[in-house]
C-alpha cells in the first residue's frame, strides 16, 4: 500500500478535530479499496464474490421535531464491491453531527444514513436503525466452530508473515469451521490496537491448527485497517491452501461507539448481524 497516498494523508485519524453537533455529511471520508487490493492482487474478478463490511453504530442520537433527543442503534452493511471503505473516525464524527439536528422520524434518519454512506463508499450500503427496545433481547453469542486458541505452543515472533501457512493444508478434504479470538492488529494510521475474533469456514484439505494460529498471531504488530486484514487472510488462505470454498469473517471490538465486522466469502451470503462477548 502507498502510505503517502493523498487519500490517507487527508484523513482525520490521529489529528485533533472539532466535533460538530449539526448534520454535516461532508465529514465522511472515503479510503479507496484499490490502495490495498492492488498489492494483494485483488481485481474486479475478486477471489471472493460475496461480502460486506458490517458496522454496528451504538452512539446514534438526534432530535425529533419537538426538540426531544432520540437514541437508537444502527446496523450498516457496506457492500464489498463499493469503490471505497469508510474511515472510522470520520464515520464517528459524521454520526455525532446528528446530535443537535431535527429529523421527522426514525425512517428519515435511516434514509439519510443510507444516502450519505452510499455516496461516500461509491457503492451499495444498507442501513437499519433500531429503537433500543429492539436490542434488549439480543443475546451475546460466540462464533460457531472449533476454537484453536488453547494450543500449547511457543511464540517468539510477532512480525507478520504468511509463510506460517506453508504446508498448512494437509490430509483429506473436509468441511469445517475454525475460530480464533486472538486476532489483533493495529490501525494503519494511528497504530492503536484493534482486537477481534475471526471465523474461517472452508471446504478443502484439512488445515494444521498450529500453523494457522501462528499465522493469525503474526498480525499482532501489523498495521492495516480491519477490512484489509480480512481480505489479506482470505487471499493468503486461497494462495496457500487452494480451498474449494472459503469464508473469512471477523468481528472487532468497539471503538468510538462503532464496531466493524468484515465478511468475505466465495460461497456464503452475509449473515445477520450479531453481538459477541467483547462487543
Curated annotation (Swiss-Prot):
GO terms for cellular component: cytoplasm. Substrate binds at residues 86-88, 226-227. It is an enzyme of class 1 (oxidoreductase). It holds the Pfam family QueF. The keyword Cytoplasm applies. It catalyses: 7-aminomethyl-7-carbaguanine + 2 NADP(+) = 7-cyano-7-deazaguanine + 2 NADPH + 3 H(+). Its main location: cytoplasm. The active site is at 187 (thioimide intermediate), 194 (proton donor). Keywords: Cytoplasm, NADP, Oxidoreductase, Queuosine biosynthesis. Its EC number is 1.7.1.13. Pathway: tRNA modification; tRNA-queuosine biosynthesis. Catalyzes the NADPH-dependent reduction of 7-cyano-7-deazaguanine (preQ0) to 7-aminomethyl-7-deazaguanine (preQ1). This is NADPH-dependent 7-cyano-7-deazaguanine reductase.
